[in-house]
């Protein structure tokens, strides 16, 4: 006796829910399988989390270069510091601006590099 898949489906459709549940249990026992839906394994939490784009930047003066006077003038213009403070910052290097937008950080970097300084934006 050969049953087609269609005849099997029709026979199952005629059964009540309780009878179908008993059939499923019998199939699980007979073949050693489980009818439970497989659990989805997600990737690592870091991979699932969206990457946040940096919105605040820090502009740091690394080196004044050969045109120290031009760099001091640029530092004064950018920071609003007095002559002595701008000179000290230019000679020692350090943070010029903190928590600024990307556009402002790029503008400051461009001005100082035009004066001959080495600048880093983080």
Curated annotation (Swiss-Prot):
Pfam families: Ribosomal_L12 (PF00542), Ribosomal_L12_N (PF16320). The keyword Ribosomal protein applies. InterPro entries: Ribosomal_bL12, Ribosomal_bL12_C, Ribosomal_bL12_C/ClpS-like, Ribosomal_bL12_oligo, Ribosomal_bL12_oligo_N_sf. NCBIfam families: L12. Homodimer. Part of the ribosomal stalk of the 50S ribosomal subunit. Forms a multimeric L10(L12)X complex, where L10 forms an elongated spine to which 2 to 4 L12 dimers bind in a sequential fashion. Binds GTP-bound translation factors. Belongs to the bacterial ribosomal protein bL12 family. CDD domains: Ribosomal_L7_L12. GO terms for molecular function: mRNA binding; structural constituent of ribosome. The gene is rplL. PANTHER family: 39S RIBOSOMAL PROTEIN L12, LARGE RIBOSOMAL SUBUNIT PROTEIN BL12M. This is Large ribosomal subunit protein bL12.
């Amino acid at each position: 006796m050969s049953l087609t898949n269609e005849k099997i489906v029709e026979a199952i459709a005629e059964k009540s829910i309780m009878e179908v549940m008993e059939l499923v249990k019998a199939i699980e026992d007979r073949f050693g399988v489980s009818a439970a839906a497989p659990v989805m394994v997600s990737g690592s939490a870091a991979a699932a989390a969206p990457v946040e784009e940096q919105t605040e930047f820090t502009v740091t003066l690394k080196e004044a270069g050969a045109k120290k006077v031009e760099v001091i003038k640029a530092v004064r213009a950018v920071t609003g510091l007095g002559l002595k403070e701008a000179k000290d910052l230019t000679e020692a290097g350090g943070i010029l601006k903190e928590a600024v937008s990307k556009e402002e950080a790029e503008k400051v970097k461009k001005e100082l590099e035009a004066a001959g300084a080495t600048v880093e934006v983080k």
